[in-house]
């Protein structure tokens, strides 16, 4: 069984869409094996998104991700990483397929509701950033 990491971003929390988005994710066959609600500091957001440090949007991304509470989750499913990227849709909601999380709920490319790991390797690294092994529930 494969795992991926997602983060319901501050815009999702502010718009009170946590339940709707989790429902969408679970209906797509994913099992939530870890979840918490946190408020990232700028330092933590910068560390998490360090891979984008040289990109022009890095500062705005760090500011946004530290602007309010977010909900990181570890999800489990066969082919989790690729399937989840399909479920959430393109980064820009204007380009996202109908019925995807971003098409349904996101307002812009910068505030796009949700993060999804882009590879199995990054999913493991990102999951370890937010969760200890004790916080991850083994699926039955």
From Swiss-Prot:
Record HAMAP family: NDP_kinase
Q: Does the record's keyword annotation contain Membrane?
A: no
A single GO BP: UTP biosynthetic process
Q: Name one Pfam family in it.
A: NDK
Chief location of this protein? cytoplasm
Q: Which protein, by its recorded name, is this?
A: Nucleoside diphosphate kinase
Q: Which GO terms describe its cellular component?
A: cytoplasm
Compartment(s): Cytoplasm
According to its UniProt record, which cofactors does this protein need? Answer: Mg(2+)
Purpose of the protein: Major role in the synthesis of nucleoside triphosphates other than ATP. The ATP gamma phosphate is transferred to the NDP beta phosphate via a ping-pong mechanism, using a phosphorylated active-site intermediate.
Which controlled-vocabulary keywords does the entry list?
A: ATP-binding, Cytoplasm, Kinase, Magnesium, Metal-binding, Nucleotide metabolism, Nucleotide-binding, Phosphoprotein, Transferase
Task: Tell me one GO molecular function of this protein.
Answer: nucleoside diphosphate kinase activity
Q: Which SMART domains match?
A: NDK
Q: What class of enzyme is it?
A: transferase
Q: What is its EC number?
A: 2.7.4.6
**Active site residues per record:** 115
Question: By its UniProt entry, which Gene3D superfamilies does this protein fall under?
Answer: Nucleoside diphosphate kinase-like domain
The record's section on NCBIfam families has: PRK00668.1 (NF001908), PRK14541.1 (NF011113)
Q: Which family is it part of?
A: Belongs to the NDK family.
- Would the keyword Cell wall biogenesis/degradation turn up in this protein's UniProt record? no
What binding partners and quaternary form does the record give? Homotetramer.
Where on this chain does ATP bind?
9, 57, 85, 91, 102, 112
């Amino acid at each position: 069984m494969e795992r991926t990491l997602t983060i319901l971003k501050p815009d999702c929390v502010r718009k009170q869409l946590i339940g709707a988005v989790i429902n969408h994710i679970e209906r797509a066959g994913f099992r939530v094996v870890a979840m918490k609600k946190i408020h990232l500091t700028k330092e933590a957001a910068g560390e998490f998104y360090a891979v984008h440090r040289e990109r022009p949007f890095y500062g705005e991304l760090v500011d946004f991700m530290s602007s309010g509470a977010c909900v990181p989750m570890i999800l489990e499913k066969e082919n989790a990483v690729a399937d989840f990227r399909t479920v959430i849709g393109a980064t820009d909601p204007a380009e996202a397929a109908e019925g995807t999380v971003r098409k349904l709920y996101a307002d812009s490319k910068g505030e796009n509701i949700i993060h999804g790991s882009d590879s199995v390797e990054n999913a493991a690294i990102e999951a370890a950033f937010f969760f200890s092994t004790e916080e991850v529930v083994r699926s039955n």
